[in-house]
Amino acid sequence: MAEKQTAKRNRREEILQSLALMLESSDGSQRITTAKLAASVGVSEAALYRHFPSKTRMFDSLIEFIEDSLITRINLILKDEKDTTARLRLIVLLILGFGERNPGLTRIMTGHALMFEQDKLQGRINQLFERIEAQLRQVLREKKMREGEGYTTDENVLAGQLLAFCEGMLSRFVRSEFKYRPTDDFDTRWPLVAAQLQ
């Protein structure tokens, strides 16, 4: 019984990995059909549906992976790092680095892969970015408690600016067909971004 569960879990992972790879390829800029995905995995469409009730659920599983990966690591940053600017830098670098290492998932994060899918998936990504923005806002607000001095600019504006920078770099990565990596020249870009945090 345990072997059967492991085999099923492995097949589910294989399907999700194939979907992510298809999103990374030129197929990712078009609607991905279950027929194309089944051919990529080497199974029938019926076999896909034995593991996932719908293509929406496949995308939902990838979004869960993105969310778990980012939120878990953000929480580790918040636990380990106490300096506000360092925290913000690490969170921004985490988001950009995750996108760079997972180009297919970046198409989901930017919404490009979801244009042809159900609206609820875009809603899930919106919620993820709202959670990240709330985390950034909280870090910005805690500066006054931790360091004795807050920002003169509203923390909502600053959090939105940091998130817009991340989203812009991820969109540029997708638009360039993954040529312009989000972390390229980060050590030069970060001081420009950090200078806005006043």
UniProtKB/Swiss-Prot annotation:
Pfam families: SlmA-like_C, TetR_N. Residues 117-145 form a coiled coil. It is found in: Cytoplasm, Nucleoid. InterPro entries: DNA-bd_HTH_TetR-type_CS, Homeodomain-like_sf, HTH-type_TetR-like_transc_reg, HTH_TetR, NO_SlmA, SlmA-like_C, Tet_transcr_reg_TetR-rel_C_sf. One of its GO terms (cellular component) is bacterial nucleoid. Belongs to the nucleoid occlusion factor SlmA family. Required for nucleoid occlusion (NO) phenomenon, which prevents Z-ring formation and cell division over the nucleoid. Acts as a DNA-associated cell division inhibitor that binds simultaneously chromosomal DNA and FtsZ, and disrupts the assembly of FtsZ polymers. SlmA-DNA-binding sequences (SBS) are dispersed on non-Ter regions of the chromosome, preventing FtsZ polymerization at these regions. HAMAP family: NO_factor_SlmA (MF_01839). Homodimer. Interacts with FtsZ. This is Nucleoid occlusion factor SlmA.
